[in-house]
Regions:
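Short beta-strand-to-turn element immediately C-terminal to the catalytic PLP-Schiff-base lysine
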Residues: 99-101, 140, 166-170, 184-186, ...
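Flexible, small-/acidic-enriched active-site or ligand-binding loops
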Residues: 134-136, 188-219
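Short Gly/Pro-enriched turn/cap motifs at secondary-structure boundaries
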Residues: 127-130, 154-157, 173-174, 200-207
């Protein structure tokens, strides 16, 4: 069992106080209706250091670890699944610049993102390609830098982004095979087209867009990291990303459980509170055990990452465990609410939608099981 430090408990308290002051049901409903998170709430979250809490203070980050980022995500998402996720996603992508960028890139791009003045949108997913596959998009080198072409899908924060991060195939050098590279692209560059991909079951506060790059000119300083290292960078990105998402999923699971408990404590059936029935207690017990098991798994993964001991398997297990716990908790919460659980008036249906959307992000359950299974079985002769 990981014993949280005083500073880590303070992160939880700060997140709880913020959410209680900023999150409410009507704000969440209105934001989801229009598909846009209130910009002023982003600003206040950034002012408290919630955007990029695990990134260096030198670039306006929080200077803490991934475990603190997980605690923040869990707390925010437990209090409101939709609004909490939107705050957590405000700085998504900044970690790539912090991990792989040059000193100049970090100084130029990170402070505006982490201070809430702009956003970065991660454009990695392509139609017909596995999430870890070499990209079909290309970046052709010339004497002025690169020419970027390709189409990306399911890009969150695209509408409010100041920059995109993307992955494109680049020619292999003398020591590179199957090379791909990561790039920083100005959102207002000529040749970029952003198209809304429509409403989704969940995750609507961060949007979802198709982004097309058509002969987009990139100067040499827009290469993120070394040429040909894009797939290795992608693997490192997914390891951190999955643990962060596991923190969000853990919050969704806890939030759904708390709402189920609150309902069974007050709902009367056959002249008794339904929380008094053994079948209800058993359902709640099973959920509580599953959520606590997920919590231990996620905290351990985050602590391992901070200690430099995490790997793809650790991250995949954390996200798989937490995401499936979130879906199970939200599903059972709906069942315990009866017909009311399906109504928009109650929050549990929204937790289910957000949990389902999150389970498909940065690796669906099948992708994660592939990672874990391959690691456990090892290479076959």
């Amino acid at each position: 069992m990981i014993q949280l430090t005083r500073a880590q408990k303070q992160v939880q308290k700060a997140a709880r106080d913020f959410a209680k002051g900023e999150f409410d049901r009507e704000t969440a409903r209105e934001a989801e209706k229009i598909g846009q998170f209130p910009e002023e709430v982003f600003q206040r979250a950034a002012a408290l250091g919630f955007v990029g809490i695990q990134l260096p203070e030198a670039y306006s980050g929080g200077g803490m670890g991934l475990l603190e980022a997980v605690l923040l995500a869990e707390t925010l998402c437990a209090l409101d699944g939709s609004l909490g996720q939107a705050v957590c996603e405000a700085g998504h992508g900044a970690e790539c610049i912090a991990r792989f960028g040059s000193q100049d890139q970090k100084e130029r791009f990170l402070p505006p993102i982490l201070e809430g003045r702009t956003a970065v949108a991660v454009a990695f997913v392509e139609a017909g390609r596995g999430i870890s596959s070499a990209p079909a998009a290309t970046a052709a080198p010339d004497d002025k830098g690169w020419l970027l072409n390709g189409t990306k899908h399911f890009v969150s924060n695209a509408e409010r982004a100041g920059i995109f991060l993307t992955l494109a195939a680049t020619p292999a050098g003398a020591d590179e095979t199957g090379a791909a590279s990561m790039f920083i692209v100005d959102a207002d560059a000529a040749g970029i087209r952003v198209t809304d991909e429509g409403r989704r079951l969940g995750g609507n506060l961060t949007g979802g867009a198709e982004v097309t790059f058509d002969e987009v000119r990139l100067t040499p300083d827009r290469l993120l990291g070394k040429p040909g290292r894009g797939l290795a960078q992608l693997e490192a990105y997914y390891m951190e990303r999955r643990i962060l998402l596991a923190g969000q999923a853990l919050g969704l699971a806890q939030g759904a459980l708390e709402r189920a408990v609150a309902y069974v404590r007050q709902r009367v059936q056959f002249s008794r509170k339904i929380g008094a029935f053994a079948v209800t207690r058993h359902k709640i017990a099973d959920l509580a055990a599953r959520v606590e098991a997920a919590r231990l798994t996620v905290y351990q993964a985050a602590a391992a990452f901070d200690a430099g001991q995490a790997d793809a398997r650790t991250a995949a297990i954390a996200k798989l465990t937490a995401a499936e716990a979130a879906i199970a908790a939200a599903d059972e919460a709906i069942q315990l609410h009866g017909g009311y659980g399906y109504m928009r008036e109650y929050d549990v249906e929204r937790y289910y939608r957000e949990a389902k959307a999150l389970s498909l992000t940065a690796g669906a359950p099948g992708d994660l099981r592939d990672v874990v299974g391959a690691s456990v079985i090892g290479k076959l002769k």
